């Protein structure tokens, strides 16, 4: 089954496409879902695209054995002008006179009010915007359940997360950053990598003697691992910024470049017994 939605009567523009495939067999239940969504914001250069997917399989192997797997994730790409509380696009647009042209005859921004006080032209936030935020996220979940005897069962499940993000931005010599920093251009790339998993093992026993008497016992053992790595590289005074952009930050003023990185690892092991 494929469905498609499109709304273009008024901005923002929103497009959605979905595809669903379901298979049912004697001992197998499987379904697949994919989705695409594209949003174009009211402000130019503002957009969001996301592709998502899911594959789910459940099966009964034996009378006493069940298993299943769930794989899902998404890829997302967004971009937006500078919309901040301080000196952002919306704030600047509210106060900047509409009778002043965005640029003069030489293509330079008119960055001042009538009386001569300095302020960044709000159209520069849109026309000079050059940034992208990309995320790819994948999750895998699986389980195995053993029905050992009447009322007694054991279930082990494992979930894995793989998450990778890349945020890039280029501030050329006409950007807001250059306006505030003596015409100095900037390029920045930030990457995040996360790997984590969670394993949960549950042993449960339920026995009913009559309407008023029942035994319910549960034992749980759980362990998890989380590994996060972040890296940021920032360059200033970029060469051939309109041609190379973020693709080679080494073509810049090496004396001003900065790099930073960090890694955080978390582990956990816990248990619980309840009767």
Locations of the language-model features?
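Outer-membrane beta-barrel architecture
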Residues: 20-22, 33, 56, 141-143, ...
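Active-site and adjacent substrate-binding regions of carbohydrate-active enzymes
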Residues: 151
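Surface-exposed loop/interface segments of Gram-negative outer-membrane beta-barrel transport/assembly proteins
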Residues: 1, 41-137, 155-270
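Intrinsic-disorder/low-complexity, polar/charged segments enriched in Ser/Thr/Lys/Arg/Asp/Glu/Gln
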Residues: 16, 137-139
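Structured alpha-helical segments in the cores of large, soluble enzyme domains
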Residues: 17-23, 266-275
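Residues embedded in well-ordered regular secondary structure
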Residues: 1-45, 81-85, 108, 124-132, ...
């Amino acid at each position: 089954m494929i469905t498609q939605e499109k709304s273009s009567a008024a901005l923002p523009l929103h497009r959605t496409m979905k595809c669903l495939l379901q298979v049912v067999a004697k001992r197998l239940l499987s379904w697949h879902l994919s989705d695409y969504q594209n949003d174009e914001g009211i402000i130019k250069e503002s957009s969001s695209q996301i592709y998502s997917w899911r594959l789910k399989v459940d099966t009964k192997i034996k009378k006493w054995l069940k298993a299943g797997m769930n794989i899902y994730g998404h890829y997302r790409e967004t971009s937006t002008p500078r919309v901040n509380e301080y000196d952002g696009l919306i704030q600047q647009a509210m106060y900047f006179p509409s009778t002043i042209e965005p640029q003069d005859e030489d293509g330079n921004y008119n960055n001042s009010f009538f009386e001569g006080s300095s302020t960044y032209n709000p159209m520069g936030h849109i026309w000079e915007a050059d940034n992208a935020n990309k995320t790819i996220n994948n999750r895998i979940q699986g389980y195995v359940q053993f029905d050992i005897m009447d009322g007694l069962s054991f279930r082990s499940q494992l979930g894995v997360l793989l998450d990778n993000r890349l945020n890039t931005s280029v501030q050329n010599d006409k950007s807001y950053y250059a306006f505030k920093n003596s015409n100095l251009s900037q390029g920045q790339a930030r990457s995040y990598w996360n790997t984590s998993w969670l394993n949960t093992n549950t042993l449960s026993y339920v026995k009913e003697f009559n309407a008023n008497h029942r035994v319910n016992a549960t034992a749980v053992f759980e362990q998890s691992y989380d590994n996060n790595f972040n890296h940021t590289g920032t360059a200033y005074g970029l060469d051939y910024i309109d041609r190379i952009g973020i693709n080679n930050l080494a073509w810049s003023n090496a004396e001003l470049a900065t790099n930073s990185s960090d890694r955080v690892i978390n582990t956990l092991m816990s248990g619980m017994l309840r009767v």
